Regions:
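Carbohydrate transferase catalytic cores enriched for Leloir-type hexosyltransferases
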Residues: 1-130
Length: 130
């Protein structure tokens, strides 16, 4: 299977739960899976060490505020590489509707739904819209 993973959290959220989870997910898959092919999206200039031959890094030029990358670039790259599954580990934030392959997210918590007063209005809107 050809699997794309949004690995931007490894760089952008390093030291947080989502950043640590994303890094450990990629590292663990690298250690145990020699059969599937992986395309890991990372911010331009970032890298992951000691990846096996079935892992490729796709550098992306985007920042936290841009959604052009999510809406246009990701779907095109996934199509160009015939990806069968795309995983977004950060609560599905940034998951474009324009993606043609199967999609998966990791939902870390539902605090914005259960206790909306504990999160910013901006995050609450993003969470509810996604």
């Amino acid at each position: 299977m050809k699997i794309g993973i949004d690995g931007r959290a490894v760089k952008w959220y390093r030291g947080t739960g989502i950043g640590t989870y994303t890094h450990q997910l990629i590292s663990s898959l690298n250690n145990v899976d020699k059969d599937n092919d992986y395309l890991i999206f990372l911010p331009d200039g970032s890298s992951l060490k000691n990846l096996n031959d079935n892992f490729r890094v796709e550098p992306v030029k985007a920042n936290l505020q841009e959604n052009f990358w999510d809406e246009v670039s990701v779907p095109n790259i996934l199509d160009d590489h015939s990806m069968e599954l795309y995983h977004v580990p950060q609560n599905g934030v940034g998951l474009s509707e324009n993606i043609n392959c199967l999609k998966a997210i990791t939902l870390h918590d539902i605090i914005p739904l259960r206790m909306p007063e504990t999160v910013s209005d901006r995050y609450l809107k993003i969470f509810n819209d996604e």
